């Protein structure tokens, strides 16, 4: 699902809100989440999951075009850990 599909679906379910209002709310929510992670804080949405930063240590990588070794700096990457309720709902999907 894309952001625009989410906005469309929420606008249909919440008839008292226009698509523009839903879009504004989604954009603001995502901006607040990004700012929280930028500040090094963790986000927890009970039942859904949590977002945090994990540090990826410096390492030696490889340039796929040339095959030469490249030193990569350490960096923080966003990490999502699903909550119990979300895990249970996904586990219940019959394949």
From Swiss-Prot:
Pfam families given in the database record: Bac_DNA_binding (PF00216)
Top-level taxon: Bacteria
Region (Disordered): 56-76
InterPro entries noted in UniProt: Hist_DNA-bd (IPR000119), Histone-like_DNA-bd_CS (IPR020816), IHF-like_DNA-bd_dom_sf (IPR010992), IHF_beta (IPR005685)
MF (Gene Ontology): DNA binding; structural constituent of chromatin
An example Gene Ontology CC term for this record: cytosol
SMART domains to which the protein is assigned, alphabetical: BHL (SM00411)
PROSITE patterns on file: HISTONE_LIKE (PS00045)
Keyword vocabulary terms for this entry: DNA recombination, DNA-binding, Transcription, Transcription regulation, Translation regulation
GO biological process: DNA recombination; regulation of DNA-templated transcription; regulation of translation
Record has Cytoplasm as a keyword: no
Function: This protein is one of the two subunits of integration host factor, a specific DNA-binding protein that functions in genetic recombination as well as in transcriptional and translational control.
PANTHER family associated with the record: DNA-BINDING PROTEIN HU (PTHR33175), INTEGRATION HOST FACTOR SUBUNIT BETA (PTHR33175:SF5)
Family per record: Belongs to the bacterial histone-like protein family.
Oligomeric form and interacting partners: Heterodimer of an alpha and a beta chain.
Descriptive protein name: Integration host factor subunit beta
